Structures are given as structure tokens and as C-alpha cells.
Amino acid sequence: MRVLFVASECFPYVKTGGLADVVAALPAALRELGIDARLLLPGYPPVLAALGEARPLRDLPPLPGAGVPGGRLLAGTGTADGARGPGALDPAVPLYALDLPAFFGRGGNPYSDADGTDWPDNALRFASLSAAAARIGLEGDGEGWRPEIIHAHDWQTGLVPAYLRFAAERTGAKRPVSVFTIHNLAFQGLVPPALLADLDLPPHSFSIHGLEFHGKIGLLKAGLYYADKLTTVSPTYAQEIQGPAMGFGLDGLLRARARDLSGILNGVDLGLWNPASDPLIPARYDATLLEARQAAKAELRHAFGLGSVPDGPLFAVVSRLTHQKGIDLVLEALPRLLALGGQLAILGTGDKVLEQAAAAAMHDHPGRVGLVRAYDEALSHRIQAGADVLLVPSRFEPCGLTQMYALRYGALPLVSRVGGLADTVTDVTESSLADGSATGFVFEPVGLMPLIHAMERAAALWRRPDLWRTVQRNAMGRDVGWAASARHYADLYRQAVMDTTLLSK
């Protein structure tokens, strides 16, 4: 089976969130199952550097409204920069890049400039990537390889299924099956309808029975409407987005497509996130050597300017600082956290008001609250190794990876019962302690008092070190790798090909 992944980011080259981790790990896990999975990325400078002496395969025409020359399709393995190491793209995964400097040779992050302002031509940039993927699917890569399935991810590649569908309607050509994964329904890629022709979209597509959404072109909706199969990143989130509370106006479409929608949990790169071999933490350990975490805790306190002799757990946050992530609730609960003898370490950036509130908390509580306003991959590893409790009180969370990293490292996750958090963390109760399934602390509904009560339960268990270590060992023993998820995707691909074949007869 031949599968082409197409996405806007991939760790370690470009990362703004968990999408990059998934795109880096899942193709390699699928190749372990004998699936010829390959990856297409925008030709950002780090991607082109990783390709090194890439093979130019073919020229690609521009979109009608692009205003720039067409791009080139390059191929390689993504390891030519010599940076293969923890987390680098598996060399077994063939990598394609769309070399289009006018769109992708920029500073800043993939979607915005250095000041955080979205690039005004984002729709054309990522539509160009989607068009390149569709062309590979319809015509091949120039070396005789053509995918049977194209797996697109989030709004940036939502036009891939649409381009495939329209090309097949226009020419009668056989097209590959399209699979579209929703990593976060909140980000929808809404653009003005005046761009319809510029994006090479037919007039009839601008309809409620198409990609129109409240008077705009919905790039995410295009993927939801035109893809053959839909997935999202946890079973619970797949159910949540079919209701108005978390459907962001698309719940009706998702209910209509419920038979084509699957929730498949993300996994963790077990090579990258392994406390027994992690080069980024002060001391390596496993579930039989939990005392080695003390060195990581001491180093973590030093990094965040925290006191060395607390009377309670060291709580931590590794997150975008946003309302969705419940950071405001953490700050509201801070007086109770401190009254429990706890400390708080926060790593992240995001909403400026929340950043300022966190900075004020650090100023008001020196030695008890620490803040690093950055995205720092190495420091995130050290937090997982040194924290007692990882706080993830999200209002919604499609899957979440940070709580799975916490399980792996023995930092007990304290999470809201939403999305993938509900699917990956088992609450500490008498029954779960008795049967060995307890792995953390889960609260509902999302709100201040439920969060505080969960903090109180965590602090109480922390004062019972034997039980605490038991739950840590439970957490570290949970299978959070990609193998099971990859098997689910492989089954989905086979079913999608079978269904499409039957429909075409």
C-alpha cells in the first residue's frame, strides 16, 4: 500500500504543536507494517537543508492567483544535514519538499511573521502545497511512484481532497483515496470568497454542500466535505465534535459523516521520549529507579528559580498559554496550590494577557512560581523528568501529547476529562489503585473548584510516597507508543480503498 502524507509542519524541522510530532512519527510506524508511507512538506529552509543534495523530480505549475512562479518537487530522506538524532525524521521515510521560495523561504513560523502576524497569503501558500500533493496523486512523483492514498492534515491541506475530487470529475481520471485528519477543529482556515478562482476552485464548490462556511471559503471544511475518510486524534474527541459545544459550527456536517469518521489516538515517539536513554535530562531512569528523578527535580527547581525544600508537590505546565489550555484556571487556583505547599513551573508562550499574569505570579511568589516564556524542547524534557504533577486543565483537547510524555516520565498528569485526556489518563480512585490502572488525576467539569479538588487529591497522594510511586510505575508502564495506532490507520486505509473500489463499480 502506497500512502503520501502531506502536512504543513514536521518535527524536528518546523514545529508549532503536536501536529509536527504526529507527522514525524506515524509514517515511520506505518513503514514498520510494510506500508510505503512517504511525506510531502513545504520547502521551508530547515526542510531544504535537511534534504541537502535533493533530487529534483518535476516542475509544478502555479495556482492561477499565486502571483509567483511554479515550484519544484524535490526528494530525499531528510537526514542530509547530519542532524539525525533523537526525534529526527526516520531515514526510512522518503521525504518530498515543495521548493517554492516565494511562499516558503521566509522567517518567522510557518503561518506568521516574526511579530506573530499571519502571512496575508497563507491561503495561496498552503493551497499550493495541497495542489502539489493532488498532482502527485493524479500523475505520480516523476520517478514512477504514485500513492493509492493521500493522508492530509488540518486546514492547511484541506484542499487536497477537494482538488482530487474536482480533477476526477473534470477529467475522469482515477484518483487516489483521500483521508483527512482533524488535529484541532478550532482552526478552520477561513478566507474570503474572492479567492475562489485564485485557488483554482470551481464556482459550484462555493456552496453549503461544498466548502462554503458562513460566507467564506472554509479550508478545513473542504477536507471534511470532500475526503473519503475522516479521522481525528482520539475517540472521545471524535464524539465531542459531533455536538454543538465543541463542533465549532461543523457538528452537523460531522454528524452527517459519522460513518466515515474515526477517532484514533496519537502515540509517542518512544525513542525520543524515553527517560532511560534521554540525553536531555540530568539522570536517566526507569520505573525501577524512580529515586533518580530527584536529580532532575533539583535541576528543574534551579532552572525556574524555585526553592529547594517545598512542603508539597512540584506542579508544572508545558503548554501554549491560552484560554483553551485552561491556563487562566491554573492561575486562579494558584493560592490553593501554594497553600498545599506546592510549587509551580510554567513553560510556554501565547496570549499576552496570560503571559503577563503568569509573570506577575512569579514576581509575587518568588521561589514558589517560575516562568520561562519560550518554546524549549530540551527544557520540556527536563520538566517531564523533574515535575511531580503535570497540569493539563484544557477546556477541549483533541488528543494532547504532553500528558502522554508525562505518563512516560512518571510526572503524574492532572487533566480535565475531555478529548484525548479522557482517553489516556485513568483517575486515581480506590478501585483503580486496587486493580493497578490508576495513572493520574482526572476532573470534571472544567472549572476552578474541580481543578482545586484534583490538586488537593494530588497533594494528599504525594504525602503517601509508597502509593505515589505505585501510581508512577503504573503510568510509566502504560503503552503510549505508535504501534497500535499505526495498525488502526492501516486498517482504515484498507477499508477506505475497499469502499472506494466498491463505489466506483
From Swiss-Prot:
Keyword Glycosyltransferase: yes
InterPro entries found in the cross-reference section: Glyco_trans_1, GS/SS, Starch_synth_cat_dom
Binding site for ADP-alpha-D-glucose: 15
Pfam families, per database record: Glyco_transf_5 (PF08323), Glycos_transf_1 (PF00534)
GO molecular function, one term: alpha-1,4-glucan glucosyltransferase (UDP-glucose donor) activity
GO process annotations (BP): glycogen biosynthetic process
A single Gene Ontology CC term: cytosol
Its EC number(s): 2.4.1.21
Swiss-Prot/TrEMBL catalytic activity: [(1->4)-alpha-D-glucosyl](n) + ADP-alpha-D-glucose = [(1->4)-alpha-D-glucosyl](n+1) + ADP + H(+)
Pathway: Glycan biosynthesis; glycogen biosynthesis
Keywords, alphabetical: Glycogen biosynthesis, Glycosyltransferase, Transferase
Family: Belongs to the glycosyltransferase 1 family. Bacterial/plant glycogen synthase subfamily.
NCBIfam families cross-referenced by the UniProt entry: glgA, PRK00654.1-2
Role this protein plays: Synthesizes alpha-1,4-glucan chains using ADP-glucose.
PANTHER family assigned to the protein according to its UniProt record, in alphabetical order: ALPHA AMYLASE DOMAIN-CONTAINING PROTEIN, GRANULE-BOUND STARCH SYNTHASE 1, CHLOROPLASTIC/AMYLOPLASTIC
Protein name listed in UniProt: Glycogen synthase
